[in-house]
């Protein structure tokens, strides 16, 4: 035998002559030459695993490279012979032995192809890839490295591995537009030597008419590898129904993980699979194969299974590998896009929308062929449905704010949970401003329309009063605040105490104002003009509260009705004055007792309100006390009527609006 005997040398057969294994072959400068059709057939038959146990136990491509070259040259020799027959006769009738031999060779090459793929395929390392990298830095593989891989494959095509069938290497066509995408991060899925071997086998199988078998083997093995990578990435096989039956809390976590995994799948896993299929199959052609009437003789299957592609072989193999996984990946996003709409889903749906929108250019690059159009269309349709879901959820949110049914008054007139929820919600909406400005294109309507039941009253609001440069999103946010106020006004009517109703509105509108001021993006959209209107509203509510509460207190400190005129004298009626002091004490004590339990959560507003009350109450009481104290103190038991100094009242005001019962009853603490 030429070359040293080793474990991968072919078994000897009865057809060999005594001169050795390759009596009809020779070597020239280290390149093995197969000199005749007969010697080529012998080489093929010696590796027939159906008749030789030794051939079954050994793989050609795992052994001596000279043996690999001999086998591939033998295949080329037989294929060239068949081609010559087909070209020399209008009705070719190739030798049966030759066609049987090529069938044996193709079966062997199919096994070799599968074995190389299996031994070289490993799932991606999820831990290293599930790390977000900036788009500008995400293409970790340089174009030089890729060019070297292409050159290696092309060089192999020019050697005895690939040159025999005359197919062009097509290396230059590998440099597709995806190499220019800064977000694509391709990795080497299989080593360069294995890629070269796979390409040399694929070239011969395709030339012999075994395209379908080659594609099926490739797709089967690589799809298993992709499936394993999916498992490593935590991508579950869930149907759309399975996903829609999950609780939203569980889905939120899955959405968060899906976004990370989808970036890896599109930009690395699928892109790398596309590159691998190009390295192996791009530029291969069946043009050098025998003519169509002879092709069925070379197929292990029936003629009806002949494979035809409108796209390139590399694209066919790529889609055979990833189309199923890609559909599985997108099914998750599709299930979310068509799930039941509710306000709490908006932000995760927007996260999903933004992630898919960001991936769409990469999807268009990775799945650029006509054959992959369905995947591009599916992704675009899901994106459209997510956008529609976001619009629908915002509409549902507006409706929910208007309809919120709670009628139980909030204790102490503090901030209603609905107010906190709505303002936190629209503050989060402002974080997605850029996306929602693109998605929300129709203006809100303050008139009754199809969104609202005819039985439900809707606030009137003239949007034309606002500045014209408002985005439609800004108008919707203002509309949400309008209907929130409208609902709060209705809720305030459930307070029996009118002053508490005003106090409630003051607290809630003030919270709305402060939330807008504290969220720059929200403030920019709402605008200072509308913010001033809201500020005016809570101040009016504060004024109305003070009037409803403190006017009746201050009325006790007026002079009217205290002066009397008689036939013998004129002056102050002590009995009326005593009643006036008693009324003041009683009313103020009741206000103090009740309103100490009322709550103003905002420290600054609470202090401003106390100061405003003190500025009205204390001067009036001090003046009243100065004018009439002597009349009370000249009588009996003056302490029953003048119970408090103005300092006592000043201290008592500080007990108000803490949300707790007064720590002690009012009592005289000082003597003015």
How should each PLM-predicted stretch be described?
Residues 25-32, 36, 56-70, 90-101, ...:
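Non-transmembrane, amphipathic alpha-helical segments
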Residues 44, 51, 116, 120, ...:
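Short, flexible helical or helix-coil boundary motifs
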Residues 5-26, 487-496, 500, 509-512, ...:
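Extended, charged coiled-coil "stalk/tether" helices of large eukaryotic trafficking and scaffold proteins
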Residues 29, 36, 67, 71-74, ...:
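Alpha-helical interaction elements in eukaryotic regulators
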Residues 243-526, 620-624:
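Extended alpha-helical solenoid scaffold regions that build the rod-like backbones
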Residues 216-220, 229, 442, 527, ...:
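Short coil/turn segments at secondary-structure boundaries
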Residues 49, 53, 81-92, 115-122, ...:
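Flexible helix-coil junctions and inter-repeat linker/turn elements that act as hinges
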Residues 1-332, 343-354, 650-672:
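Eukaryotic N-terminal, low-complexity and coiled-coil-prone scaffolding/targeting segments
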């Amino acid at each position: 035998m030429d070359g040293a005997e080793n474990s991968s040398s072919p078994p000897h057969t009865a057809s060999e002559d005594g001169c050795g294994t390759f009596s009809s072959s020779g070597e020239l400068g280290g390149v093995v030459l197969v000199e005749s059709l007969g010697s080529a057939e012998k080489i093929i038959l010696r590796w027939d695993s159906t008749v030789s146990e030794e051939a079954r136990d050994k793989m050609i491509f795992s052994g001596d490279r000279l043996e690999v070259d001999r086998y591939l040259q033998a295949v080329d020799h037989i294929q060239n012979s068949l081609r010559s027959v087909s070209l020399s006769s209008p009705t070719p009738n190739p030798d049966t032995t030759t066609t049987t031999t090529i069938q044996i060779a193709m079966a062997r090459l199919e096994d070799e192809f599968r074995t190389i793929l299996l031994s070289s395929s490993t799932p991606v390392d999820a831990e290293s890839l599930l790390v977000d990298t900036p788009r500008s830095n995400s293409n970790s593989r340089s174009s030089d490295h890729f060019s070297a891989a292409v050159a290696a494959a092309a060089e192999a095509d020019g050697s005895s591995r690939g040159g025999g069938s005359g197919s062009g290497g097509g290396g230059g066509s590998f440099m597709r537009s995806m190499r220019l995408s800064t977000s694509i991060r391709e990795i080497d899925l299989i080593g360069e030597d294995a890629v070269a071997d796979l390409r040399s086998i694929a070239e011969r199988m395709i030339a012999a008419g075994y395209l379908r078998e080659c594609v099926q083997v490739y797709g089967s093995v690589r799809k298993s590898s992709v499936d394993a990578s999916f498992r490593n990435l935590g991508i579950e096989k869930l149907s759309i129904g399975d996903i829609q039956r999950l609780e939203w809390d569980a889905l939120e976590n899955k959405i968060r993980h899906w976004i990370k995994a989808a970036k890896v799948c599109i930009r690395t896993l699928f892109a790398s699979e596309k590159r691998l299929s190009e390295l192996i199959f791009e530029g291969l052609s069946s043009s050098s194969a025998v003519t169509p009437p002879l092709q069925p003789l070379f197929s292990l299957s029936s003629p009806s299974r002949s494979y035809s592609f409108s796209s390139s072989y590399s694209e066919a193999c790529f889609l055979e590998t990833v189309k199923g996984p890609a559909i599985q990946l997108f099914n998750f996003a599709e299930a979310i896009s068509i799930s039941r709409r509710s306000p709490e889903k908006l932000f995760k749906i927007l996260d999903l929308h933004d992630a898919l929108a960001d991936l769409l250019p990469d999807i268009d690059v990775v799945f650029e062929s006509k054959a992959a159009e369905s995947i591009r269309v599916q992704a675009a349709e899901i994106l459209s449905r997510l956008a529609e879901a976001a619009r629908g959820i915002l509409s549902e949110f507006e409706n929910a704010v208007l309809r919120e049914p709670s009628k139980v008054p909030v204790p102490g007139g503090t901030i209603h949970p609905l107010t906190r929820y709505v303002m936190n919600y629209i503050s989060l909406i402002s974080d997605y401003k850029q996306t929602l400005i693109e998605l929300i294109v129709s203006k809100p309507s303050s008139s009754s329309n199809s969104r609202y039941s005819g039985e439900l009253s809707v606030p009137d609001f003239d949007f034309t009063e606002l500045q014209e440069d408002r985005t439609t999103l800004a108008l919707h946010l203002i509309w949400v605040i309008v209907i929130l106020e409208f609902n709060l006004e209705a809720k305030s009517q459930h307070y029996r105490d009118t002053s508490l109703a005003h106090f409630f509105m003051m607290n809630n509108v003030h919270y709305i104002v402060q939330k807008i001021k504290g969220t720059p993006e929200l403030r920019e959209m709402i605008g200072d003009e509308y913010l001033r209107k809201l500020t005016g509203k809570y101040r009016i509510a504060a004024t109305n509260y003070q009037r409803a509460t403190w006017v009746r207190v201050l009325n006790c400190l007026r002079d009217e009705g205290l002066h009397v005129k008689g036939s013998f004298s004129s002056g102050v009626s002590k009995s009326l004055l005593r009643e006036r002091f008693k009324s003041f004490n009683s009313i103020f004590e009741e206000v103090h007792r009740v309103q100490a339990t009322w709550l103003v959560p905002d420290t600054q507003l609470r202090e401003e309100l106390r100061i405003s009350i003190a500025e009205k109450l204390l001067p009036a009481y001090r003046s009243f006390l100065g004018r009439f104290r002597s009349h009370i103190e000249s009588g009996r038991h003056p302490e029953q009527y003048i119970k408090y100094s103005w300092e006592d009242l000043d201290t008592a005001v500080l007990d108000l609006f803490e949300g707790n019962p007064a720590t002690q009853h009012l009592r005289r603490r000082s003597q003015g």
